[in-house]
Swiss-Prot record:
Name of the featured protein: 2,3-bisphosphoglycerate-independent phosphoglycerate mutase
Organism encoding this protein: Staphylococcus epidermidis (strain ATCC 35984 / DSM 28319 / BCRC 17069 / CCUG 31568 / BM 3577 / RP62A)
Record-level GO BP terms: glucose catabolic process; glycolytic process
Binding-site positions, Mn(2+) 2: D12, S62, D438, H439
GO cellular component, one term: cytosol
Length: 505
């Protein structure tokens, strides 16, 4: 007899917001979501700031969201942890950072600092760059070259000049540091093995090849004149003493989120890299703020804090069969991040990865691979052996990042169609679904004056539990979702999970 599965369905980047203006969630025709919302118990939970282990007021993101969801507790994020280490001075005593400085001194070489130059807080924070500059100043090294990656996605599309000016003020104040190269994150921070993009960023950084400008500001302004926003700024070099990354140099990459920092790091550190032809740098000291992946051979500045008894581990220990399913863009989130930073499958776990479409930007194909994800899940449900399903629909977030209202509405409508088939099937099997999200985005894709808004929001996310006769708590946080799943599965919640079931008892 087929099992009665319990599913967690994450509509990525889908939150509650009162105003209809620029709100694709409100404007989309979503009869299935609305039907479940009217029929079943609902609540809303917090998905940003202190509730997910980020600084107060900081918007959530997919990595943070899935980690909190899977852990069933507040997970203090790298950003909060690094900020704290800078505030209490531990940062300046960090062994790896000081080893990088020592390497530069011993070799009479240069320190290169890579990272996303913004205060978006999703991948990095530019104040961490300032702390590295302060460390260099304290240690008396003068050749410090900053290779800045421009954001325009987690912050305003044209905000780079503000960060560049503040960084140049810091160079002057400390008497240390200069910009060496600048690239839009589209090139330097790809995560889909589009090596042609990475190659352009790499050539600017490593070989000092590319368009040349007298200053970082001049290069960005030239791009703006051609209607190129920060994310897409073509890699360029800044005139100065730097001549690229050379033998004996050191690199500190201050992005703390791994997924978009791994590829560039792999090019520099993995001798087996074959995405394009590279000349390896000899005697290079390469440090990354966190562990990016197993293909990156680097010293780790902030080692991972292990998370035990995440939802996947608890399912395994209770002999449950679980499925993780998503398309490429969100696959690491339902696997690695949901498992607390673990790549290996648990016993009884299987995974389905559906390829994301190969398009330049997802507004060109708002449905992405939602229908294929849905079909794959229906196929898995037909096997009748699943207890737990962890599913992500990427569309509201990935299309929401375009800052375009119509495609984002289409994205949500496509997901709603798929949601209906999936949830109805689970209910027909006697199972239950929790429909929710990991953070906001598609709830506001236009600013009040109709400019594209490509960032996440701090709005609370909806929760629908398709079980009649229960009452949900009025509020909660992402860390309460795993305990709610365990509640539906009648599985005891481990002590490490400090979240609380959203179901009132």
């Amino acid at each position: 007899m087929a099992k009665q599965p319990t599913a967690l369905i994450i509509l990525d980047g889908f939150a509650n917001r009162e105003s209809e203006h620029g709100n694709a969630v409100k404007q989309a025709h979503k009869p299935n979501f609305d039907r479940y919302y009217e029929k079943y118990p609902t609540t809303q939970i917090e998905a940003s700031g202190l509730d997910v282990g980020l600084p107060e007021g900081q918007m959530g993101n997919s990595e943070v969201g899935h980690m909190n969801i899977g852990a069933g507790r507040i997970v203090y994020q790298s950003l909060t942890r690094i900020n704290k280490s800078i505030e209490d001075g531990e940062f300046f005593d960090n062994t790896v950072l000081n080893n990088a400085v020592k390497h530069v001194k011993d070799n009479g070489s240069a320190l290169h600092v890579f990272g996303l130059l913004s205060d978006g807080g999703v991948h990095s924070h530019y104040k961490h760059l300032f702390a590295i500059l302060e460390l260099a100043k304290k240690q008396g090294i003068d050749k410090v070259y900053v290779h800045a990656f421009l954001d325009g996605r987690d912050v305003d599309q044209k905000s780079a000049l503000k960060y560049i000016e503040e960084t140049e003020d810091k160079f002057k104040e400390l008497g240390v540091g200069q910009f060496a190269s600048v690239s839009g994150r589209y090139y330097a921070m790809d995560r889909d093995k589009r090596w042609d993009r990475e190659e352009r960023a790499y050539n600017a950084i490593r070989n000092f090849e590319g368009p040349t400008f007298t200053s970082a500001k001049a290069g960005v302004e030239a791009n703006y004149k051609n209607d190129v926003t920060d994310e897409f700024v073509e890699p360029f070099i800044v005139e100065g003493q730097n001549d690229g990354v050379n033998d004996g140099d050191a690199v500190i990459f201050y992005n703390f989120r791994p997924d978009r920092a791994a590829q560039l790091s792999e090019i520099f550190t993995n001798k087996a890299f074959d995405g394009f032809k590279v000349e390896q740098v000899d005697n290079l000291f390469y440090a990354t703020f966190t562990k990016y992946n197993d293909n990156v051979d680097a010293e780790i500045v902030f080692e991972k804090v292990d998370l035990n008894n995440t939802i996947g581990e608890v399912a395994q220990d209770n002999g449950l069969k679980q499925l993780r399913i998503a398309e490429t863009e969100k696959y690491p989130h339902v696997t690695y991040f949901m498992s607390g930073g673990r790549n290996e499958e648990f016993e009884g776990e299987r995974r389905r990865l559906i390829d994301s479409p190969k398009v330049a930007t997802y507004d060109l194909k708002p449905e992405m691979s939602a229908y294929e994800v849905k079909d794959a899940l229906l196929e898995e449900l037909d096997k009748g052996d699943l207890d737990l399903i962890l599913l992500n629909f990427a569309n509201p977030d990935m299309v929401g990042h375009s800052g375009m209202l119509e495609p984002t509405i289409k994205a949500i409508e496509a997901v709603d169609e798929c949601l209906g088939e999936v949830v109805d099937k689970i209910i027909d099997m006697g199972g239950h679904a929790i429909i929710t999200a990991d953070h906001g985005n598609s709830d506001q894709v236009l600013t009040d004056d109709d400019q594209p808004m490509t960032t996440h929001t701090t709005n609370p996310v909806p929760v629908i539990v398709t079980k009649e006769g229960v009452t949900l708590r009025e509020t909660g946080r992402l860390g309460d979702l795993a305990p709610t799943l365990l509640d539906l599965l009648n599985v005891k919640q481990p002590s490490e999970m400090t979240g609380e079931s959203l179901i009132k008892h």
